[in-house]
Amino acid sequence: MLRRIVAATMIGALALTSGCAFHNPFAKKAEPVTYEAVVQSELSPEEKVDKLVANMSDADKVGQLLMIGIHGTTLNDDAKFMLNEYRVGGIILFDRNMESKEQVKTLITDINKAGKSAGLTPLFIGIDQEGGAVARMEDKLIKVPPAEELSQGSVDHAANLAKQVGTELKDLGFNINFAPDADLGLTYGRSYSTNPDQVVKFAGAVGKAYDESGLWYSYKHFPGIGKTDVDLHADTSVVPVSKDTLLAEDTKVFVDLIKQSKPNTYMIMVSHAMYSQIDPDHPSSLSKKIITDWLRKDMGYNGVVVTDDMDMGALAKHYTFGDMAVQSIQAGSDILLVCHEYEHMQEAYNGLMKAVKDGTISKERLDASVKRILLMKMSHGL
């Protein structure tokens, strides 16, 4: 099935990119602009990013917007094909990819080698390792209690444990952990508290500890999913509360964390919940009112915005993957997580490429996201 879709995709890509060009046989070929050379140059970080983006193809730019899951515990041919053909910016691993520490180290090493061979910019290698109910390879990695349980102890204890986890994950080859959870009162003990100030104290300390261990991290799930009444993995949840209520409760956590956290050390993950009094037509991850107008303009967040997994029922039951990808980037997201099905990843990529080619996503909009992503990658020496 994958090969048939791939064949169709390649034909479509050729149709999109074909054209005529005239070449001067006496013209001196410009030296290729490599990521490594630019990073090691004396330019400022912003100048480095501008130079890289100016020399990237649309295909490479669009690939940066995707962080995908792969299948298997080794880097098989299908996974290599996804890296080569879709130029992705990152990989996220799950239990299905993880059997032992040595196996995970080998897999991540092979992923990075394949990315380098394909000429990709260095990859985000991610994991969900919150602790409690959301933990990978539990029997072989440091065991972390649920956030609710951790919050019964000291902030220092939570931070020290997070630093140990970060060091362990970094040693395996990961460079971003999609944690801590910054929501209020989630089920399964995933939240530190129902009190915003308490969540800020714990989530902020845990995030800082991840940074000190050499990992990027992610506050999630903006603007807060503690008031949802449907599991977003299954379907949409409509939350009929006002922006003022959210700013006093769930979203206050994010406002405070943005103020105290070091730029380019973290992402903000946006949820798929719908907040009907703010945007009655779109879930948060597809909402310009929530991402661009509220998070970026009103709250002043200039860093990377990543979506929750787009394979979740809250989106997948209601949109095609091409449409949801385009709408999310238009809304202000930078990275789309598509974690489980290669076909869905391909549909998202093809939808984005088409939107870039026909101007639905402008060059300026595309470049803005790619610049944020590359600036973040450079911040930890990728």
Feature annotation, model-predicted:
Residues 1-26:
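Sec-dependent N-terminal signal peptides of Gram-positive bacterial secreted proteins and lipoproteins
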Residues 21-122, 129-135:
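N-terminal hydrophobic targeting/anchoring segments and the immediately downstream early-domain regions
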Residues 63-70, 88-93, 123-129, 176-179, ...:
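Hydrophobic faces of well-ordered beta-strands that scaffold small-molecule active sites
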Residues 141-154:
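A charged helix-plus-loop insertion that forms the helical arch/lid used to bind
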Residues 71-73, 96, 130-132, 181-183, ...:
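Active-site beta-loop-alpha junctions enriched in small/polar residues
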Residues 57, 100-116, 194, 198-360, ...:
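Second-shell residues forming the walls of enzyme active-site clefts
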Residues 71-85, 157-168, 248-256, 319-327:
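Short, acidic/polar
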Residues 112-142, 161-181, 207-224:
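Glycine-rich, aromatic-flanked loop segments that form ligand/cofactor-binding clefts
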